[in-house]
From Swiss-Prot:
SUPFAM superfamilies in the record: Metalloproteases ('zincins'), catalytic domain
Source organism per UniProt: Proteus mirabilis (strain HI4320)
Leading EC class: hydrolase
MF annotations from Gene Ontology: metalloendopeptidase activity; RNA endonuclease activity; zinc ion binding
One GO term describing the cellular component: cytoplasm
Protein name, entry field: Endoribonuclease YbeY
Function statement: Single strand-specific metallo-endoribonuclease involved in late-stage 70S ribosome quality control and in maturation of the 3' terminus of the 16S rRNA.
């Protein structure tokens, strides 16, 4: 049995066009059960100011970013389904979707799946890691009926 629990926090003034809680759960369920059958994830939707502050504090990057992933780290003897937190910047997602000629929904789905894979320990710093992670993202997104998010970059 698999179960995905979502704690959705909306900390942005403009909520128009945000995905529904059901959409977020669909995207989480597309990736998490195959890795961690019972998972609890917090998704916090923020504006550029909060994203910028967190990105500067935790990554040393002086700009807002699309998604930040904060894995929950419990002591080994504590078994909790808490996977971690995803902080997603609404404005950056919308801007990137436009720049990449994707629908906003498609890019939201990509950012949730991308962030979840980070929570699960995947990364894209090294080329081989990036290839593996991008392959998983593409496979999951295509199962959901979305295009390969890296198609533009590959052409």
């Amino acid at each position: 049995m698999s179960e995905v629990i979502l704690d959705l926090q909306v900390a942005t003034e403009n909520t128009q066009g945000l995905p529904s809680e059901a959409q977020f759960i669909t995207w989480l369920e597309a990736v998490l059960p195959q890795f961690q059958p019972i998972s609890e994830v917090t998704i916090r939707i923020v504006d550029e100011a909060e994203s910028h502050e967190l990105n500067l504090t935790y990554r040393g990057k002086d700009r807002p970013t699309n998604v930040l992933s904060f894995p929950f780290e419990a002591p080994p003897e504590v078994e909790l389904p808490l996977l971690g937190d995803l902080i997603i910047c609404r404005q950056v997602v919308e801007k990137e979707a436009d720049e990449q000629n994707k629908t906003v929904e498609e890019h939201w789905a990509h950012m949730v799946i991308h962030g979840c894979l980070h929570l699960l320990g995947y990364d894209h710093i090294e080329d081989d890691e990036a290839e593996e992670m991008e392959g998983l993202e593409t496979e999951i997104l295509q199962k959901l009926g979305y295009e390969d998010p890296y198609l533009i970059e590959k052409e």
